[in-house]
Amino acid sequence: MATRRGDTLIFPKPPVIAAHACIGGKKEGESPLAAEFDELHSDNRLGQASWEAAETQLQLQTARLCLKKAHATEKDVSLLLAGDLQAQCTASGYAARALGLPFAGLFGACSTMAEALGVGACLCSAGMADGLLAMTSSHFCTAERQFRTPLSYGAVRTPTAQWTATAAGACLLRPAGQGVGIRAVTFGRVQDLGIRDINNMGAAMAPAAAATLLRYLTDTNTQPQEFDAICTGDLGHVGSQLFRELLAAEGLLLKNHVDCGSLLYDAEGQSVHSGASGPGCCAAVLCGHLLPRLERRGQHRVLFLATGALMSQTTFLQKETIPAISHLVELAAPEEQNGGNT
């Protein structure tokens, strides 16, 4: 069972990520991280009749590949925790329909992967699940249609805008065994510093990431330099700079910060402006880039902070400000699972 210190839940016997998988689309196949995806599609429709159906197919393929890599089947999964950006999380719901698994849909916007890992770790630690799938996805075309403008409109993108990844990532969690351990989880609190620009999600989300990291460090009495990497979800280039500035104002100079949204694409070569975004962005970078490094013991302790902007199409049209949240998961290489200060 987990123990609580402030807002942070610590697992004396860390649940493990027994297997993971990530699949991307055409732009991801042209990215610097292309070789780290398990599979890539040159057709972003994935042979489906609509973009929305394509995203469902992306989740289905990723979930099944994750189970295959674990030599498991749907019968070995107690619960599916999944989410996406579509209204009412329809990509996840339709994928759950096809998988036939017990399903709890989650929505934390682009923070959903960390949310799913955190909730899943709690359930595994409490003995409520023997095998649990945590999964998120996003699709550039579904997100553009829902939150911005139709693709055929040809709107000019601002320098602060980010490119929603067409990608999905899935992790199979187990209460114990071989795999990267989840040692601690900090569920974030909603932050809102008054940003209204839907084309500057990084600025809206940076305060949430800073607040959650500061709370975790206080709860666990740790320092940033104790970790090989502090990895945010999709702040992008603009949001990452603001994140570091906010922490510098609190006396913390981060030298080990990386951002999934900054890593995924070549900002200039792929014309993505401030970087990548979407629940599939951090899920894919986690499953294809971060977890393998921990498994190879190239890194030993990593903080994974996914961030999400909690607005909707309606609140944007009503000119509301953009609230944001960030959830943190501490990941440890297999031999580090029961060590450290936490």
What positions do the PLM features span?
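Short, well-ordered amphipathic alpha-helical segments that serve as non-catalytic structural scaffolds
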Residues: 55-71, 119, 204-219, 285-290
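Active-site-adjacent elements of ketosynthase-type condensing enzymes
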Residues: 84-100, 134, 140-153, 239-241, ...
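Conserved beta-ketoacyl condensing-enzyme motif
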Residues: 17, 51-110, 226-241
